[in-house]
């Protein structure tokens, strides 16, 4: 397995398969591997809700000030764990953008108020998993393991393989 590959001389004349290490993960904080999986969500819509409106399931987020919201095209039907709400903020360059409301079946909503419109015109996707927030981070936030996160991604997600 992946962990056995890093035992070096302890497995002399043995064969080991990489397993999850192929994707940049191993259950040992002393072993640093590069992240190989990124997840980007397309910005489907930008909305300017009225003060007092609510967002998401159970109306858990209430608009209290002038706000620019982005509706992102990924949800729990795609395998995105609902516990990503614990993360609270995504990053776009130097900007932190809060997740508002709950992850829904097909979308999540983020507060884009701090992002200049010029930058929004240049981007069409928001990173959810990348080098700054890896699957390992998401697994920790969701009290699970990276295997569960990776195997939950659904068929609706477009996969791009880079050589």
Model-predicted segments: where are they?
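Active-site anion/phosphate-binding pocket segments in diverse small-molecule metabolic enzymes
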Residues: 2-163
